[in-house]
Amino acid sequence: MYRAGEPGKRQSGPAPPRVRSVEVARGRAGYGFTLSGQAPCVLSCVMRGSPADFVGLRAGDQILAINEINVKKASHEDVVKLIGKCSGVLRMVISEGSSHVEPSSSDEEGGLCEGKGWLRPKLDSKALGINRAERVVEEVQSGGIFNMIFESPSLCASGSEPLKLKQRSLSESAALRLDVGQDSLCTPHPSMLSKEEISKVINDDSVFTVGLDNHDDFGLDASILNVAMVVGYLGSIELPSTSSNLEHDSLQAIRGCMRRLRAEQKIHSLVTMKVMHDCVQLVTDRAGVVAEYPAEKLAFSAVCPDDRRFFGLVTMQTNDDGCLAQEDEGALRTSCHVFMVDPDLFHHKIHQGIARRFGFACTADPDTSGCLEFPASSLPVLQFISVLYRDMGELIEGVRARAFLDGDADAHQNNSTSSNSDSGIGNFNQEEKSNRVLVVDLGGGSSRHGQGSSPGWESVSGRGSQPWSAPWNGTFCHDSEAGSPLETSPNTDRFWDLTKHSGPVFHMEVPPATLRSSIPPSKRGATGSSCGFNQRWLPVHVLQEWQCGHASDQESYTDSTDGWSSVNCGTLPPPMSKIPADRYRVEGSFAQAPLSTQKRDWSRKAFGMQNLFGPHRNVRKTKEDKKSSKLGRGVALAQTSQRTSARRSFGRSRRFSLTRSLDDLESATVSDGELTGADLKDCISNNSLSSNASLPSVQSCRRLRERRVASWAVSFERLLQDPVGVRYFSDFLRKEFSEENILFWQACECFSHVPAHDKKELSYRAREIFSKFLCSKATTPVNIDSQAQLADDILNAPHPDMFKEQQLQIFNLMKFDSYTRFLKSQLYQECVLAEVEGRTLPDSQQVPSSPASKHSISSDHSNVSTPKKLSGKSKSGRSLNEDVGEEDSEKKRKGAFFSWSRSRSTGRSQKKKDHGDHAHDALHANGGLCRRESQGSVSSAGSLDLSEACRTSALERDKAAKHCCVHLPDGTSCVVAVKSGFSIKEILSGLCERHGINGAAVDLFLVGGDKPLVLHQDSSILATRDLRLGKRTLFRLDLVPINRSVGLKAKPTKPVTEVLRPVVAKYGLDLGSLLVRLSGEKEPLDLGAPISSLDGQRVILEERDPSRGKVSTEKQKGAPVKQSSAVNSSPRNHSAMGEERTLGKSNSIKIRGENGKSARDPRLSKREESIAKIGKKKYQKINLDEAEEFFELISKAQSNRADDQRGLLRKEDLVLPEFLRLPPGSSELALSSPPPVKGFSKRAVTSHGQEGAVQTEESYSDSPATSPASAQSPCSAYSPGSAHSPGSAHSPGSAHSTPGPPGTAQPGEKPTKPSCISTVQEGTTQAWRRLSPELEAGGIQTVEEEQVADLTLMGEGDISSPNSTLLPPPPLPQDTPGPTRPGTSRF
């Protein structure tokens, strides 16, 4: 490793001060020391285990001579150049300092882990300088010191040294990197800075004095995963030993290896290639990590020229002691590992199983519409791997530089220059070149290779042949042989053209290969004073930007937009390069302005920047202003520092940046034709607004303030950070009637910042939020599920995070629903256009609502006070059609106008005010606090706007994907395919079946709506809609006094007493005189407990006073006949029959024996309290005939009045349809039909409680997921064997019953116990027919009765009937239609 005579090991202690001569071989990462000061220069640090350490150099030693040149009084710059020009053994005369730093102090700089290669050095804040800054940046950028370097005899300045493996230190001195490329001892460049200017640039620049002393900022956990991609492993082949012609031989061997394995058609083994920050791991689905390639052993990678699917990784073999293995002095052992990328696995559906097998979740790539883990080509993989490349020496760099060239170009040796620029602190990531070269796959396009016949790298064309090299060399090297910038401009332009066709990742930012390239020896001349402008200088501006940005490591990668993203030819992976990293940049974290104009000018002057980028300016003029100084001084270190700082952060943040919500992927609000790239060149998220193709200057995104509107499309989080964005988003939500969501989110955000110790303020704000948004009487209720409900006791002990769950739900609702539509809305488009054109943002009130806005009225809220019943009279079809083109203001006006008509449904609005009862409480399975989920719950008439909005957006829905989103009770969501010809019932039956949900125990609602949907509608009308399943409680109720049992479905949040009172009242019983207990228990049941506690239970009602049961029974016998006639007298009556009443509303069901006339009286709610106090006994004296007649009169008057004023009163509404008229001889049926049961939804059921074969449910009374045992009126009772269908006139199989004692039934007959099935079903059929016009119009029909979901009769029978006849058996619906249901997928 070292020359004879060199000390073999470190001296044990500091040597006495003396002058001695040492020879230091260039090691793996350089010489291993850093310099400071001048005249003479002093060694400020010596890396432990480095060549300098081995020869006994210590910190504090003074350099007196270098290669027989006296430098005792030379400037720092001159010493740096001399050291940098020497690529072989460095001969120095040093004077040992009197105060040597203890050898262990080099630990601060980092050391060697035995067998592990170089560790990242730690920073020494006492020695911060250009050297330290460069080293640190380089360290952070690359992630570790690599163990490989190839040297050629011709690389040495003298040209006489044999090829050896030498070590280079990681911690190069700044001076060594300052190697400006011109031998100042010979011919100073006229534009070079003076020594004073150079010193001022270095000393004044904050980057060298601030922020680099904290090694924690740069140290990264090596286990951080950068990316994981699934590739196929074919095999590994050891490459033959090579000599001086390593580049050609290695490249040919690699290609031969890949061709051989490909020709053998070896079956590849799928492995996950994990690119870590310091290694590449191969992981199988069973055995775990099977191979690991440390970064220091990676030489380079290449794509197979014959088949781009194949690529190879070349690794160097090392000995156990960490040194590279050497078979002899001139050869190294290398291996090529060949992999392939299978494009057939690109599509997500195809590789889902593979992803599950490997145990990871796919990350969507919005640009390729695929997944990052399954690339379509090998380029993304190579781009990630290339980040790990280290400085392996110029020979390996030559191999890398040619790795992508076509075979025809192999004859032209890629004679890269020697790495004289690597002045000891080296490990100046040569991968910079390879990174860029690897990505820029020029194929056979690059034919201007230098014709260097010598194997000794004598032509700059190795990299100069690649178009970017010549201009650099021409600029830096004042040599007649070196091409001038003008001469190489055509090459550069040609390269740019090539990269255009290669995709955005190929856009040149800085000449990749030549960032470190020096002029080859042949052009340097024998004197060694060549113009090898070793651009080792670390750009001050680059360092400053890197340092400033690194403070926020999570976002530091965002600055990659300025040079380390797509334009940088592969320094970052395709997803990162295609999605501007700036999208997640917090303003101010990067984009620091240059230090000053003076410093920028100095830097340009120092490094020949005035004419450096001449050929490139017209290509990257949009980046010129921001990056001129950075690119001008653009050395590989600068790029690697910026790039890998970004890369590393990207490694951590990859999931955050790429697994983005749907709204980010759909944020293309402006087409390419509307906004050009020039218009959006500074837009933070321009690729969200127009395609990359139209944005040649995508990477110049910078000024957030100037493009704030465009930044709103970056992410929903970004939108919420901008007060102006929040204001416009709030205006948008206001038009969609969902402003309460953003208000709630803001209130919760403010609440979370209240100090935890301020209990008074917390309590006040908590109750304010609760009363305004969450309670049952909230003025602006928000839509959250039952799991997020708050109990009263929580409000008594508030804490800042108590609303976190609710806030997150609303946040997600806005993000995945409202935000996406906002980006597509006309309001946002107007804002974007105004910003691009330089105008002030438009007034949100002047911008009309977009179609998306109209559409969202139904999906977000049914909060307009619209008429309650669409189905009662066929009015819905006509009224909705007439309103199709109306504006929101018209809808509001109509809603307010029609809100009074809600009273026709038993004074519902008044009741709502008093009781805060809302259908959306269905989700509250745990009996939590009730709350309304939409503003429309103030009235139960929101479905008009739902249908209107649905119809107005019918065209858009037809174009959209045919699916809908269903939110399940457990908080998850499913995307359900909808298909024309399949009913909602069929679709949801399959959904419930797949998820193990009891279809009978749920109801289906529109998100934001409070009415169940009618399940017989065609499922296609649900396309693109958001739905939710609300839980219900199923239980059996045994009425012992009358020997009856009923199966009930109730809203889980209702108290037991609210549910049982209307049921027992319907059967003429008084709940107060009955004992309620659970089967098998003797203790009375707590009637105040939530009904959810009875789910699946059997509840028994027993008499406390036996005489009361007899009175009730006698009372029942006379009622059915008259009640039946009342039912049939009104064609609208069935509308009310589906209503289910809660506490205080039981009068609507207590038609017999109670104040029936108040069932539709608006003043009912006021009388309920008195009813509860006075008791049922008093009301039993009321004449039931009069009550029924009054009930019908009220119903007719209110219904006709509403229809008449709306212009919807029709003749058929005034006459009972034929199919509802009782046929002659069907008096028995009339006698057996009691009055309509309010508080129950009506469904035809068989004698076993299941739906009849010819079931036609009332359009508004079906429950989601097709209840297996559809509910009927609670007064309907079937004896075994009695089948029933929608109307006796049309149902040959319907059985007609004769009057009989309650609770009894004869075979084939229905018991006379309340049994209004026939009339109910006739009304149902009529209702269904009336709905058809609206269905044809594309509207979504909902159950219009307000309380329809509160209580539903599932089945009825004798008290001895088995449960299966009363309640549907879980978990699968039994009435699922036959046709196959479209599948669902959980996300």
Swiss-Prot record:
Disulfide cross-links: none
Domain RGS: 715-832
Domain PDZ as annotated: residue spans: 21-97
All residue ranges annotated as the PID domain in the record: 227-339
Crosslink (Glycyl lysine isopeptide (Lys-Gly) (interchain with G-Cter in SUMO2)) position: 195
Modified residues (Omega-N-methylarginine): 524, 633
Swiss-Prot/TrEMBL GO biological process terms: negative regulation of G protein-coupled receptor signaling pathway; regulation of G protein-coupled receptor signaling pathway; signal transduction; termination of G protein-coupled receptor signaling pathway
Compositional bias annotation for Polar residues: 412-428, 1122-1133, 1315-1325
Keyword terms, alphabetized: Cell projection, Cytoplasm, GTPase activation, Isopeptide bond, Methylation, Nucleus, Phosphoprotein, Repeat, Signal transduction inhibitor, Synapse, Ubl conjugation
GO terms assigned for molecular function: G-protein alpha-subunit binding; GTPase activator activity; GTPase regulator activity
SUPFAM superfamilies: PDZ domain-like (SSF50156), PH domain-like (SSF50729), Regulator of G-protein signaling, RGS (SSF48097), Ubiquitin-like (SSF54236)
Tissue: Detected in brain cortex GABAergic neurons, in striatum and substantia nigra, and in the Purkinje cell layer in the cerebellum and hippocampus (at protein level). Expressed at high levels in brain and lung and lower levels in testis, heart, and spleen.
Phosphoserine carried by residues: 171, 194, 661, 671, 850, 879, 943
Bias (Basic and acidic residues): 914-923, 1103-1117, 1151-1168
UniProt cross-references to CDD domains, sorted A to Z: PDZ_RGS12-like, PTB_RGS12, RBD1_RGS12, RGS_RGS12
GO cellular component, one term: nucleus
Domain GoLoco span(s) in chain numbering: 1187-1209
Subcellular locations according to the entry: Nucleus; Cytoplasm; Cell projection, Dendrite; Synapse
Skewed-composition ranges (Low complexity): 849-869, 1261-1280
Sequence ranges of Pro residues compositional bias: 1367-1380
Pfam families reported in the protein's UniProt record: GoLoco, PDZ, RBD, RGS, RGS12_us1, RGS12_us2, RGS12_usC
Function: Regulates G protein-coupled receptor signaling cascades. Inhibits signal transduction by increasing the GTPase activity of G protein alpha subunits, thereby driving them into their inactive GDP-bound form.
Domain statement: The GoLoco domain is necessary for interaction with GNAI1, GNAI2 and GNAI3.
UniProt name for this protein: Regulator of G-protein signaling 12
UniProt organism field: Rattus norvegicus (Rat)
Lineage: Eukaryota, Metazoa, Chordata, Craniata, Vertebrata
Gene transcribed to yield this protein: Rgs12
